[in-house]
Swiss-Prot record:
Organism domain of life: Bacteria
Matches recorded under InterPro entries: Ara_Isoase_C, AraA_central, AraA_N, AraA_N_sf, Fuc/Ara_isomerase_C, Fucose_isomerase_N/cen_sf, Lara_isomerase
Catalytically driven reaction(s): beta-L-arabinopyranose = L-ribulose
EC number, UniProt record: 5.3.1.4
GO CC terms, sorted: cytosol
Organism: Thermotoga petrophila (strain ATCC BAA-488 / DSM 13995 / JCM 10881 / RKU-1)
Family membership noted in the UniProt record: Belongs to the arabinose isomerase family.
Name of the molecule in the record: L-arabinose isomerase
Classification via Gene3D superfamilies: 3.40.50.10940
GO biological process, one term: L-arabinose catabolic process to xylulose 5-phosphate
Function, as annotated: Catalyzes the conversion of L-arabinose to L-ribulose.
Amino acid sequence: MIDLKQYEFWFLVGSQYLYGLETLKKVEQQASKIVDSLNDDPIFPSKIVLKPVLKSSSEITEIFEKANADPKCAGVIVWMHTFSPSKMWIRGLSINKKPLLHLHTQYNREIPWDTIDMDYMNLNQSAHGDREHGFIHARMRLPRKVVVGHWEEKEVREKIAKWMRVACAIQDGRTGQIVRFGDNMREVASTEGDKVEAQIKLGWSINTWGVGELAERVKAVPDNEVEELLTEYREKYIMPEDEYSLKAIREQAKIEIALREFLKEKNAIAFTTTFEDLHDLPQLPGLAVQRLMEEGYGFGAEGDWKAAGLVRAIKVMGTGLPGGTSFMEDYTYHLTPGNELVLGAHMLEVCPTIAKEKPRIEVHPLSIGGKADPARLVFDGQEGPAVNASIVDMGNRFRLVVNKVLSVPIERKMPKLPTARVLWKPLPDFKRATTAWILAGGSHHTAFSTAIDVEYLIDWAEALEIEYVVIDENLDLEDFKKELRWNELYWGLLKR
């Protein structure tokens, strides 16, 4: 469902007419070699497109106008090969709506000690050209990612590739919508938020449909489509064949088919449900939700559209990478001193992209919702480094709370627990990480990912100009408290 190849990134090289045609031709040739080399590297998720060397204010303004108007353009990469006076860039940068990366590099890796002359010096001027360009970004208070180093370095390419994935997620969020079936769970605070502000800052269009519309579509699903889907279930999962289970699984298959049709029709990228508003649905969507998350849709339970949007954004960032991303909830604790752990799960809706084993379809009673016993996928989660992230609405801005965690093996069987689960150690440790999370107001609903790291989420928050706080192995609680206080002042003074 998610295709990062549909996007492209424009590579903009700055110079000026002062240098003359011969030098400008060399600038273009060297830029072309850089872009060709980058495009040959499979680390990059999308094509990088070299645009003509920019030498005047009118050329710069025109290229940004075109970038803004092109839905395929997910971001722009700028590099000043020579000195490009930054007043020429003000009009273009002032209208730019795309995520921007400032690449500070040089065509040649090393100084040619024996042959260097003033021709070489005049051609290779990014050392001061990019400083001039950096000033105008800082002066205009523009969000941007800065990557420094030679363009052939692995670390440089990794940082560019991460940012490109983030930019794709931003573009994706600006073009689809989040579908809500019903409202938020009653009386819950952290799942609420300003949907108008979300569309302004994050690009997410969030709208609600009555669950009755979905229920009518479920009733109309043909039996042959259900049987085709059951064949797929048997191939991908461990599936029971008893009559009680098959009846419940068929109902989830109907919900999945109807949901997918509805989401495609609405150009949706994510959706929410709530157990308090099920109308004529036969079951709370479980297996159906897990399957759609597996395809790439974002999801939030109990009407949590912020979690749904974040899950989708991270799924876009992690497309094609090892690991997976899921809606998650901090459910219960293991509090053995020195080995405190968090068991993450939800009633039904954990994405199988984070499974370490072949998932099992199981049918069990569910005490909430008042509907028939729902089918769901059950599995243990993957092990290794992961992130937990939550968006909360602080009244005057959104705050992204991020915690680095280590997912650990589940060493004991839990035969009576009928839900998918993952066990993790928060960094730096349970007490400090959880204290910081609670101080920051992080939600009980999160996006959990083994596919990305913290840098992706920092890039995302900075590009969208929203607040973020990171809880990791370097956490100092007193400094963290100060950061929260300073952020209150900064974001309170900041004008949009």
